[in-house]
């Protein structure tokens, strides 16, 4: 079973408070999401492998470490996931970026894939799928399905806020995927919103409904 990591770093929790605040405007909301994504990327990459190299300092030759050639990819779930990409790329600028677009079928209420674009070397990369919210888990499960059926073998899922129902759904369908969360909230309400949550992340990030 994949592990669930909840980040309690003070900076993440501080910024998350303002992300939740209904008084936070679009510009500040977007900036805060970007900043938290960077902080979470720092934590999520903690186990990247290193290799020793020789480097010439102004004083003498020295042994030091670099990341051991790991190929990484970031895949936002459209549209709200886009707001987390730049924050991650600040730390991992060489990562390739793919996209998964989903919409909810008005009759079945199930997510339907309408757009997928991934790096050509998908089988060789470790992917971080990002979406600010993990509510019912339907979109996350479908996005992970999309990556796996195209050859992805090593995937992590990262979100700002999750409901227990969403975590359970992802673990049920993708027990090999680790989940990284800034906050695990109480539950979903009758409309499928995370409680207490932060509202609709996409609407707040882009100023549109």
Curated annotation (Swiss-Prot):
Description of how activity is regulated: Allosterically activated by GTP.
Reactions the enzyme catalyzes: UMP + diphosphate = 5-phospho-alpha-D-ribose 1-diphosphate + uracil
Keyword annotations: Allosteric enzyme, Glycosyltransferase, GTP-binding, Magnesium, Nucleotide-binding, Transferase
Documented EC number(s): 2.4.2.9
Name of the protein in question: Uracil phosphoribosyltransferase
Organism (species): Bacillus licheniformis (strain ATCC 14580 / DSM 13 / JCM 2505 / CCUG 7422 / NBRC 12200 / NCIMB 9375 / NCTC 10341 / NRRL NRS-1264 / Gibson 46)
Cofactor note: Binds 1 Mg(2+) ion per subunit. The magnesium is bound as Mg-PRPP.
Cofactor(s) required for function per UniProt: Mg(2+)
Family, similarity comment: Belongs to the UPRTase family.
Positions that bind uracil: 194, 199-201
NCBIfam families registered for this protein in UniProt: PRK00129.1, upp
Binding site for 5-phospho-alpha-D-ribose 1-diphosphate: 79, 104, 131-139, 200
Annotated function: Catalyzes the conversion of uracil and 5-phospho-alpha-D-ribose 1-diphosphate (PRPP) to UMP and diphosphate.
Top-level taxonomy: Bacteria, Bacillati, Bacillota, Bacilli, Bacillales
Record GO biological process: UMP salvage; uracil salvage
Annotated Pfam families: UPRTase
GO molecular function list: GTP binding; magnesium ion binding; uracil phosphoribosyltransferase activity
Pathway linked to the protein: Pyrimidine metabolism; UMP biosynthesis via salvage pathway; UMP from uracil: step 1/1
């Amino acid at each position: 079973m994949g592990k669930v990591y909840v980040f309690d770093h003070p900076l993440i929790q501080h910024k998350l408070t303002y992300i939740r605040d209904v008084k936070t405007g679009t510009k500040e909301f977007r900036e805060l999401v970007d900043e938290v994504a960077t902080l979470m990327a720092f934590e999520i990459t903690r186990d990247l492998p290193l290799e020793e190299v020789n480097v010439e300092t102004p004083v003498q030759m020295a042994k030091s470490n670099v990341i051991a050639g790991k190929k990484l990819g970031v895949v936002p779930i459209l549209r709200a996931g886009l707001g987390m990409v730049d924050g991650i790329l600040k730390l991992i600028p060489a990562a390739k970026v793919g996209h998964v677009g989903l919409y909810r079928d008005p009759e079945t209420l199930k997510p339907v894939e309408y757009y997928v674009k991934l790096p050509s070397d998908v089988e060789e990369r470790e992917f971080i799928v990002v979406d600010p919210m993990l509510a019912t888990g339907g979109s996350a499960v479908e996005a992970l399905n999309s990556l796996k059926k195209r050859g992805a073998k090593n995937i992590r899922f990262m979100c700002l806020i999750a409901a227990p129902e969403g975590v359970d759904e992802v673990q049920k369908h993708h027990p090999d995927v680790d989940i990284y969360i800034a906050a695990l909230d109480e539950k979903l309400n009758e409309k499928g919103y995370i409680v207490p949550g932060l509202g609709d992340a996409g609407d707040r990030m882009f100023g549109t409904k």
